[in-house]
């Protein structure tokens, strides 16, 4: 290569490198993408606020549930029952084991409140879940739970409102009122993906890692989303939050303190293990309370559900 050609080639490389450096610097200085601008519209809020129907109520305190079942080792307490979900606290005595079962078209998930449980899910290695573990099983995938150790295991479990347990052919079904178990054939089953994992160790993977939260369950009809942040002063009472149309929402407090303002209910604070329920159409506002970090698991049937916020005054 002639000297003049080599010189021109070096100049070209220097020019190209300078262009790349300038471009990367410009990209670094660009601001993050902005949120979409709110759209002002007419929404249909119920004239009469939707009532709570048992077992649903504004605030279930875990302490009250435990007091009610004091001295019992194996028990269940229904906490939520509506069009979309059934959620309950379930305590299993040491050594107690569930039958292998699955659900036809719904995921089931639970959060371990205390104790140790051995979880066996078809297609996965068995694992032991302890306090703070969040576990989910896709539809038509059989699983079982067994309490380990000398203490009961306690979990908060959520399943579809119309979901009933089905059983592998080598299992004996538990009789159910109004149902007759019979042999059938079926095909296919659900699967895990980038969002939906067999389990999450909330204490290890989120709290100790100072994680940000995010969805744990997300499909076409179930959304369980961890919302995490530092404690802050409560917003003014004039901040009503938002409401939903056609579906209700509930939260399990995972960490810290969560402040709530729900239409028709005085301001209150919920603590770990507590469950809060807002019927469809009611204004509700959740905020991080206390001095440390706080996390709530928001549960509803609409991953991209509409949030009806207050419109600016004219």
Describe these PLM feature segments.
Residues 2-14:
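Bacterial N-terminal signal peptides that target proteins for export
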Residues 13-24:
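Bacterial N-terminal signal peptides
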Residues 29-86, 99-100, 165-234, 240, ...:
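A short, N-terminal "cap"/entry segment at the start of jelly-roll beta-barrel domains
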Residues 88, 99, 108, 125, ...:
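Short, conserved secondary-structure segments in the cores of folded domains
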Residues 91, 103-119, 228, 243-259:
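Short, conserved beta-strand element in jelly-roll/cupin
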Residues 99-100, 119-120, 137, 143-149, ...:
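Short beta-strand His + acidic residue motifs that chelate non-heme Fe in jelly-roll/DSBH
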Residues 123-139, 264-280:
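Short acidic-glycine-tyrosine-enriched beta hairpin
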Residues 144-197, 285-314:
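Double-stranded beta-helix
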